[in-house]
Amino acid sequence: MEPEVSLDSLLAQLATSPIAFGTDNPVNPALRADLEGALHAADVENLDPAGVVVLEQTPAHVADLRDLAQDLANSTDYGTVIVRTPQVAIGVSDHLNRVQIERGERAMVAEPDYADGLHAFARAADGVTVHWPLAVAVALLVLAGIAVAAAMTARR
């Protein structure tokens, strides 16, 4: 990770805002406003409560970002924590499953605009659902087909 990024600094920022930055940058206030606006949008409510950390560099070991996100999630009240760098988006969540998170990560990193990426993360994560009534109906149809085939074979 960036040498100047400290867990304590990120935790302090996340205590007062759902957005934290790894470095001071002149674009941070505008980016904070965009990201906070995105977090308050209706299509992002499936991430709620969410914290977003913006880092300017991707570490040599991307797994360090997942560790950072998990440490932040464990130390805050955010149910979802997303760490975004120019090349990578990493998320952890206590209410999204791994498939939802990974789809969200891929969708987010494809968006160069970080606020649009947050919307993309939420849409992709929300789009992963198992339609249980349909799954059960298909399973019953398959089982019925097997039973009919077995009955026809037994009659011969």
Whereabouts are the PLM-identified features?
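A structural boundary signal for the start of the first folded domain, especially the loop/turn
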Residues: 1-67, 90-156
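Mid-chain, structured segments of secreted extracytoplasmic proteins
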Residues: 66, 71-74
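A short, hydrophobic beta-strand-centered structural micro-motif
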Residues: 73-88
